[in-house]
A protein has these predicted regions:
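N-terminal intrinsically disordered/low-complexity leader segments
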Residues: 1-12, 215-239
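Helix-turn-helix
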Residues: 16, 20, 24-58, 62
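Short hydrophobic clusters on alpha-helical segments that form packing/core surfaces
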Residues: 17-25, 67, 71, 94, ...
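Alpha-helical DNA-contacting segments of helix-turn-helix folds
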Residues: 59-67, 142
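Hydrophobic alpha-helical connector segments
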Residues: 62, 76-106, 168-171, 200, ...
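Amphipathic alpha-helical packing segments from all-alpha helical-bundle domains
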Residues: 76, 89, 116-156, 165-169, ...
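Amphipathic alpha-helical segments used for helix-helix packing
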Residues: 99-130, 182-185
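Hydrophobic/aromatic-rich alpha-helical bundle segments in the mid-to-C-terminal region
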Residues: 105-109, 132, 136, 154-204, ...
Length: 239
């Protein structure tokens, strides 16, 4: 797991607390650990955590801020690439984020299950609910970039016109469920490179089928030359 791999004795205590919290969320769940569980592996006592965070909720809010900050950087624009290739890179990055930070998968699932647009930890970190972040807050720019990527595909003739929020719903829901159903073993250990590649390919195929222009609906978009979102070098740049 990324959190476990990046944790070192030389890291500031505040960072090490968050790294350990991420690890525990991944293996025990959002509500399955205590401050003592964080303190013990770090070789400190619980009062040392209170020097940095008011309580356990404070730790979870800060972990959520990490999540929001990384999520806010997703769907980066790649003007040097063609529309399909740029979207492929964005999809791959999204998969890497969630598979590299299994705690964020747990947080997202609990967040979705909380009435009122999300649980307080993530709402505080994001400055509002899911809906509010579509147009303002730290995630607004990410949603705007996703819209721009999709619009570029429409202009190039590679994508049909679709609502960006629907695409985000589809991608996030599909990825989260793949990582926890029928089991969540991918959250409990470092994924193998093959598992990451397979997941990227799977997400690309889902996106390809959803975005394929209607006139090509009878053609498998994954294998269609120059239109695929699957792994192909030919679509990396438009002529």
């Amino acid at each position: 797991m990324v959190a476990a791999k990046t944790r070192t004795a030389a890291a500031p205590t505040r960072q090490r607390i968050l790294d350990e919290a991420e690890r525990l969320i991944a293996v025990k769940g959002v509500y399955g650990f205590t401050l003592q569980d964080i303190a013990a592996p770090l070789g400190v006592r619980v009062p040392a955590i209170y020097k940095h965070y008011l309580n356990r909720d404070g730790v979870l809010i800060e972990v959520s801020r990490r999540f929001i900050a990384l999520l806010a950087g997703q769907f980066e624009l790649r003007p040097e690439l063609g529309a399909v290739a740029a979207f492929q890179v964005a999809l791959d990055s999204f998969v890497e984020l969630m598979m590299g930070h299994p705690a964020y998968v747990r947080l997202a699932l609990v967040d979705f299950a909380t009435p009122g647009g999300g649980m307080d930890y993530v709402k505080l970190a994001a400055g509002g609910s899911f809906k509010e972040n579509l147009v303002r807050g730290p995630l607004a720019a990410m949603h705007a970039r996703l819209r721009a990527l999709l619009q570029a595909g429409v202009r190039s003739g590679d994508f049909r016109a679709v609502d960006a929020t629907d695409v985000y719903r589809l991608l996030k829901a599909a990825l989260l469920i793949r990582l926890v159903f029928p089991d969540d073993t991918l959250l409990l250990r470092q994924p193998h490179s093959r598992e990451v590649r397979d997941t990227k390919r799977w997400i690309r195929e889902i996106a390809a089928r959803h975005l394929a222009p209607r006139r090509d609906a009878a053609i498998d978009p994954v294998h269609k030359p120059r239109r695929a979102l699957g792994p192909t070098r030919r679509s990396a740049r438009k002529p």
